[in-house]
Amino acid sequence: MKENEDEINKTDEKYKIKNPSNNGNNKNKNNNNNNNNNNNNNNNNNNNNNNNNNNNNNGNSNLENIEGLNKYNIYKKKKGKNESNTSLNNIYISSPNLSERSDNSIGSYCTNKTMKSENSIINIETLFRDSVSEQNSDECGSKVDKDLDEDDDDDDDETEVPELVDYSEMIVSILYPVCITMVIVVLAIRAISSSTSKNSQIVEISNDNSGGNGDSSSGADKMVFDSVVNSLIFLAVIILSTTIMVVLYKFKLMKALYAWLMGTSILLLGVFGGFLFLILLAYLNLGLDYVTFVIVVWNFSVGGIVCIFWYSPKLLNQGYLISISVLMALFFSRLPDWTTWGILSIVSIYDIFAVLCPGGPLRILIETAQKRNENIPAMIYNASIYIGMIYNEDNLENNNNNNNNNNIELNINEVDIENNNNNEDENKNNTEDGNNNNNKNKNNNNNNNNRIENENGAENSSENGSITPPPTIPNFIKDEKEINRSSGSNGFPNFKKCANDNILIGDAETNDEIVSNAESSIDSTISESYVKPKQSIRLGLGDFVFYSVLIGKAASYQITTVFTVFIAIITGLFLTLILLAVFRRALPALPMSIIFGIIVFFLTFKILIQYIYFLGENQIFV
């Protein structure tokens, strides 16, 4: 037994390990010595018991060969239950002074230290090293990632249910622009068609398409043939333009792609917008000179290009996208009736193929954009409703930099703590076996002049009200307010220097503050780095256009058809968005709304309106 104690004491003396858990025992021992000065025999017995506790604690210390820690890592382990004692689970401290030991055979060793205070017990696991290696830091990182993945799985399970509830906000956000577009188209068509000239032109076009009253069969055949041919030509143009866009994006010809998109936007805003502007001036009987007209159209076109393809306020960008949809819908609605119905039907069928089939051009475009983690390079209306935190690449890079800054090597070359009013009580006790253990308890009452020097020898002090935290402890304390709150009179935390070791150990309040600040910093970093944003709903401008074409064609007949078709389109879009939330994949937005709209239009025009006329002629009121 005595030989084991001698070997352990020599090991302690060689590596200068001092277990803080014994400080509490020594403190109690000193109190016993001060209170019972006359009982020397009892003091010797207490000393023997304390020395035995020292030997047992040193014997139970974990000696681990860890291949170098040059990172300073703090992370919180979630155990699933609350503990009454405040504990800092893992603090990895790398001390270069300890790495200069002559004995390299041990490599590194670990000892558990416990510091007892009046209100709490703080467990500190201190790891020393004498060689530099990245392997352990990678292991620590993988361990943290594993814990975070488990937490993310739990969070996903918790947030999976309310996601469908919050999905209603995105549905409403996409219904607003669709309704605005259709209302503007209806108002424009009703205003234009109310004039005498436009009414006469509409009658002449309808008579030409009907083929005259003489031969109704040949007129019907010609009308169907013309509508089919026009629809196929229009579909061929759509397929060609979509294929060109996919090829340009697939081969990363982004300049050509955006030049093409900008050219079409200028054509829509400048030419179609200018022509519609002339019609409105004629309808309102307003005069305008050509110079002012050109300036207005030019500013409108260039402003649209800037807002759509560059930076602009969100509402302005969405306003220009709605304007483009309105312009296209107004001109497509001027096509003959059966050509319009044929185009809407064929485009709806093609939309199913383009989005859902494996070889569809739109599906290829979507999959390519997802693989590259990029937005689809097209004029697409984005609902931009993110439930949770908005996430972008800049925030990702900043969070990664912050996470890398958390892993900083803690090099303490020199720690000098000067105390003006220090009361030192030194008690030297001799064991009966002849082994001498010197236990020193240093009680610091006033810490007025503390100085912590970094590895370059530069001093960090608080002068002229400027407080700079130690650079070796980056994320313990986040700002000056927390530094002042958890610091002594000069702005630095109250640390104590462990005897025979260059290890900083804080008192109870300082350690509690460090634990709370570190845990809150880690939790905020985890939430910023691992919280993924909710995907927003994006609807192509083509969907806006064809919805508006359908309701615009209905507006050229009766106001009753406008309301019924409007309800049918919104119902189809709503069902499509519900399916989008269920299947969680890209779905075509045209088929359900267009099919419902066409069916409701003919039912309203052939049945409901005739029924309303019948009730009105017979003066039957329901």
Swiss-Prot record:
Q: Which domain of life is it from?
A: Eukaryota
Top EC class of this enzyme: hydrolase
Which catalytic residues are annotated?
351, 543
Give TM segment ranges: 169-189, 228-248, 266-286, 290-310, 312-332, 342-362, 539-559, 563-583
**UniProt keyword Endoplasmic reticulum, yes or no:** yes
As recorded in UniProt, its EC number(s) are: 3.4.23.-
- Its membrane topology: Multi-pass membrane protein
> Per UniProt, what is one GO molecular function of this protein?
aspartic endopeptidase activity, intramembrane cleaving
**Residue ranges, Cytoplasmic side:** 1-168, 249-265, 311, 363-538, 584-588, 610-622
Question: GO CC: one term?
Answer: endoplasmic reticulum membrane
Biased segments, Basic and acidic residues type: 1-16
Q: Where is this motif: PAL?
A: 588-590
Q: Where is this region: Disordered?
A: 1-65, 132-160, 419-477
Key words, A-Z: Endoplasmic reticulum, Golgi apparatus, Hydrolase, Membrane, Notch signaling pathway, Protease, Transmembrane, Transmembrane helix
Instruction: Give intramembrane residue ranges.
Output: 589-609
What biological process terms from GO does the record include? Answer: amyloid-beta formation; autophagy; calcium ion homeostasis; macropinocytosis; membrane protein ectodomain proteolysis; Notch signaling pathway; phagocytosis; protein processing
Low complexity: bias regions: 21-62, 432-466
Query: Where does the record place it?
Result: Endoplasmic reticulum membrane; Golgi apparatus membrane
Q: Which residues lie on this side of the membrane: Lumenal?
A: 190-227, 287-289, 333-341, 560-562
- Cited InterPro entries: Peptidase_A22A, Preselin/SPP, Presenilin_C
Q: Where is the composition biased (Acidic residues)?
A: 147-160
What this protein is reported to do is described as: Probable catalytic subunit of the gamma-secretase complex, an endoprotease complex that catalyzes the intramembrane cleavage of integral membrane proteins such as Notch receptors. Requires the other members of the gamma-secretase complex to have a protease activity.
Q: Which family does it belong to?
A: Belongs to the peptidase A22A family.
Record text about domains: The PAL motif is required for normal active site conformation.
Task: Indicate the quaternary assembly.
Answer: Homodimer. Component of the gamma-secretase complex, a complex composed of a presenilin homodimer, nicastrin, aph1 and pen2.
Specify the protein name: Presenilin-A
Q: Organism, per UniProt?
A: Dictyostelium discoideum (Social amoeba)
